[in-house]
């Protein structure tokens, strides 16, 4: 019973609504720039077959166009974006410690952070000279927090290659 009522409401004044939509003004093409018009006339005079190619409809492309679905959303107003940018507090930066590595294009590093090369070098320094490169000295040198340096030294290690000497055992001969 509900479908009958809804169908009646949906089909009410259907012809007038359809006629109104059909008789609406269609959007016109945006005007071309004067320099573009002269270039188009020049190209069409050089290649007259292009004009027919432009007017011809390609059924394959039209069928592909029917499958396209566009979902658009309004962009975020610029006022909200500017407000979000101003909320961030300015960060303090420091220069990288290793200037001999030219592969890295890092100009400045935020305080409290280190680059990968700095992390590898401080891990290697701590491994080679643990008495001089203590966690306190590393934290002071690279402007890091003490707990972060302790965690770094505890859980990370540099890559190490160990070569084991060959053993003098006789191989079992296959039969």
UniProtKB/Swiss-Prot annotation:
- Single biological process term from Gene Ontology: mitochondrial respiratory chain complex I assembly
**Main location class:** mitochondrion
Q: Which GO terms describe its cellular component?
A: membrane; mitochondrion
Q: Which molecular function GO terms apply here?
A: calmodulin binding
Locations listed in the record: Mitochondrion; Membrane
Membrane topology per record: Lipid-anchor
Q: Which residues carry this modification: Phosphoserine?
A: 35
Pfam families for this protein: UPF0240 (PF06784)
Q: What post-translational modification information does the record give? A: Phosphorylated on serine. Prolactin stimulate serine phosphorylation.
Highest taxon of source:
Eukaryota
Q: Where is the lipid attached (N-myristoyl glycine)?
A: 2
Its keywords, alphabetically, are:
Calmodulin-binding, Lipoprotein, Membrane, Mitochondrion, Myristate, Phosphoprotein
InterPro entries associated with the record: NDUFAF4
Subunit organization:
Binds calmodulin. Interacts with NDUFAF3.
Q: Which family does it belong to?
A: Belongs to the NDUFAF4 family.
Q: What does this protein do?
A: May be involved in cell proliferation and survival of hormone-dependent tumor cells. Involved in the assembly of mitochondrial NADH:ubiquinone oxidoreductase complex (complex I).
What's the protein here called? NADH dehydrogenase [ubiquinone] 1 alpha subcomplex assembly factor 4
